[in-house]
Amino acid sequence: MGNHALLSASSSHRWLNCPPSARLGENYEDKGSDFAAEGTDAHSLCEHKLKTALGIPSEDPTENLSWYNEEMEECASGYATYVLELLAEAKKVTTDPIVLIEQRLDYSKYVESGFGTGDCVLIADGTLNIVDYKHGKGVEVSADHNPQMMLYALGALEIFDALYDIDTVTMTIYQPRRSNVSTYTVSTAELLEWAETVLKPTAELAFKGEGEFHCGEWCQFCKAKADCRERARANLALAAYDFAEPPLLTDEEVEEVLAKVDDLVSWANDIKEYALQAAISGKAWNGWKVGEGRSNRKYTDERLVAAAVIAAGHDPYEQKLLGITEMQKTLGKVKFDEILGRFITKPQGKPTLVPMSDKRPAMNTAKNDFMEENIDE
């Protein structure tokens, strides 16, 4: 993957909304995560699968992938198949489409020292298609006005626009673990206008560490999220509602709290984790100490435990059906659907409040049920 730029495409959603956060994050250690490591492995496998499918020599990375499993294999194969489908469509309009894999894309014309890596770049008949693989399953990622994808597209235009006279840019997110394929298409002219009027001036502020701090859902990916003063100010302002009983709040106030309460909870948890790690490292917080958390009993040696129980005349094991996820990993998705598809059902989920922008359909509430019953009568 290489080194990341200060104003990387992957972090652009954050620094475009909060320009000073880019420089602020330089003061913090760059800690990796299991999710990032898993994503890196998945990208390596995707690259290999796609190269192999295109007849490009590639060394199988599987034995060196710490997070490799059956699911990752299926996801990477699906990604390669999807790109081949795009290529087949491209060949209907041009005889020689261009396919580039893990292409370095330089967008420094608009962003100081800006560069990134495009998973797949496809060019055919005046159309540029950027495909980005996402292995995460926590948050569904949309390609619509996605700044990371738009930066990649700008980098690709710098290389190929003069050669191929590109007038249309399509950006695609392929996120198999969320069954999500999101596509956004924009004219080259519109993309370049955004680059000049929005991206370039904001990037200049971000590179200098200037501009205004702004809190939002992008804070979750900021290194300074735990002790950022602006985030604290915004969340403490919301916490003031705690001094009034909920029945005394107006509907508008409740709606305002609902829109921000997840950020408040996230911020509070970030503060607790930051303070704990600092205390473990030796920092003293007035009125606080590091205590031992709850723990559960465990066997020191399961093999010896089993032998002892068997010797006492008892069976130490339970026979239990594999869960759906483990069963699918064991059988593989195709066989799982073929053998067990008719035995699988998904009950209705527990009601939860979500914004109207959420893609899930609204559930029937007691009021809706009552209204429907009256209509039927």
Please state what every model-predicted region is:
Residues 266-377:
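Extended, charge-rich alpha-helical segments
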Residues 113, 145, 215, 254-260, ...:
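Active-site-proximal structural scaffolding
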Residues 1-128, 168-170, 182, 261:
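Metal-dependent nuclease catalytic cores that hydrolyze phosphodiester bonds in DNA/RNA
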Residues 196-263, 361, 365-377:
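Short, charged, low-complexity amphipathic alpha-helix
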Residues 31, 35, 140-142, 250:
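Alpha-helix N-cap/helix-initiation motif
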Residues 50-54, 135-138, 153-161, 204-207, ...:
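Hydrophobic/aromatic-lined pockets within catalytic cores
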Residues 17-30, 130, 138, 200-207, ...:
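Short amphipathic alpha-helical segments and their helix-coil junctions
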Residues 95-204:
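Mg2+/Mn2+-dependent nuclease catalytic core
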